[in-house]
Amino acid sequence: MANKLFLVSATLAFFFLLTNASIYRTVVEFDEDDATDSAGPFRIPKCRKEFQQAQHLRACQQWLHKQAMQSGGGPSWTLDGEFDFEDDMENPQGPQQRPPLLQQCCNELHQEEPLCVCPTLKGASKAVKQQIQQQGQQQGKQQMVSRIYQTATHLPKVCNIPQVSVCPFQKTMPGPSY
């Protein structure tokens, strides 16, 4: 009887430890940061390859940089901090009336697999953010970074990318880390 009790308690302890370890592992997987993760925004290896083959979405990077650098005359900000794309990016006349750089960006995004659109846009956004950091512009940097990610978030919708309407980038903007 003592052997059975010992065996049952040892089995329960083993399952408890196994469950506890797998819960911890799951939390670690979801809490990884792009800065410390060698894969960066590319959790899917296929997307990293597509990003490199698309020359890092050059036109999209240029568009994001242009939008970030525009102060007053660029995309409109509503009072609640949301981006108003209707005036500046979406044209009722269709894609032929888009600014040429935006049209090139949309063409690049249409060449991506739907699964890779957001990871590649995140990679392009990070590249633009690094360009702004290297330029050393301190004034309005947080607002520029916010514009980069706001623009990138809505580009799939603006470009009518099938199966993707927005890219849910996290709004994490601690002071010195950008």
Swiss-Prot record:
Keywords: Disulfide bond, Seed storage protein, Signal, Storage protein. InterPro entries: Bifun_inhib/LTP/seed_sf, Bifunc_inhib/LTP/seed_store, Napin/2SS/CON. The keyword Metal-binding does not apply. The keyword Signal applies. Cotyledons and the axis. Residues 1-21 form the signal peptide. One of its GO terms (molecular function) is nutrient reservoir activity. SUPFAM superfamilies: Bifunctional inhibitor/lipid-transfer protein/seed storage 2S albumin. Residues 22-38, 75-94, 176-178 form a propeptide. The small, basic, water-soluble napins are one of the two major kinds of storage proteins synthesized in the seed during its maturation. The mature protein consists of a small and a large chain linked by disulfide bonds. Belongs to the 2S seed storage albumins family. This is Napin-2. The lineage of its organism: Eukaryota, Viridiplantae, Streptophyta, Embryophyta, Tracheophyta.
